From Swiss-Prot:
GO terms for cellular component: cytoplasm. Transmembrane segments: none annotated. GO terms for molecular function: deoxyribose-phosphate aldolase activity. NCBIfam families: deoC. GO terms for biological process: 2-deoxyribose 1-phosphate catabolic process; carbohydrate catabolic process; deoxyribonucleotide catabolic process. It comes from Crocosphaera subtropica (strain ATCC 51142 / BH68) (Cyanothece sp. (strain ATCC 51142)). This is Deoxyribose-phosphate aldolase.
Amino acid sequence: MIEKNINIDIATYIDHSFLKPTATPEDIEQCCNEAQYFGFPTVCVYPSAVSQAVKLLHGQKIAVCTVIGFPTGANTSSVKLYEAQEATENGATELDIMINLGQVKAGSSEEIYNEISAICEATGQTIKVILETNLLTDTEKRLAAEICMDAGANYLKTCSGWFGGATVTDVRFLNNISQGRVGIKASGGIKTLEQAYELIEAGATRLGTSHGVALVQSQNG
């Protein structure tokens, strides 16, 4: 077990996420209030909640992130591009884009590259590509990671949380591929402080979780 007093400020790693399909304006307000109170650098909400989150966090040093093509990645590239541009116009500065898993499985490198690079170029925002590592072989993970880095992504993200969660093995694998070129966002099923520490030790530079408050309280307790 990793010691509780490890020299890590867990709050600074957290993308405070509220991605329940039943999210209400009151839920988004609570999410933003928690981010301010606990010092989370980012909130992650659905595209329909971006404008509200931006207004609530006006003047704060807290980024608003949203998801694109979520959670399956099966939208057409033009739809994803529109989603990304609209989210940017509404104030989002970070975009978590779901990769097209069918294209990864088929080895369609050019299509994947073109989709990600178009969004990177059109928005100029921080781009995190969700690879859904639980559904890919190691060969497919490597292919997807290398294409996304070449296309201009800023982060490789493990999972959407809909098809399993982040593992230490996958974070370490992606970190070894990236060699510091991009950040690694571990996401999905991060509920305990020990999990969080282990993922950070493996190379995660961001943690996407809806349990950020509990993690910080556990560290401070």
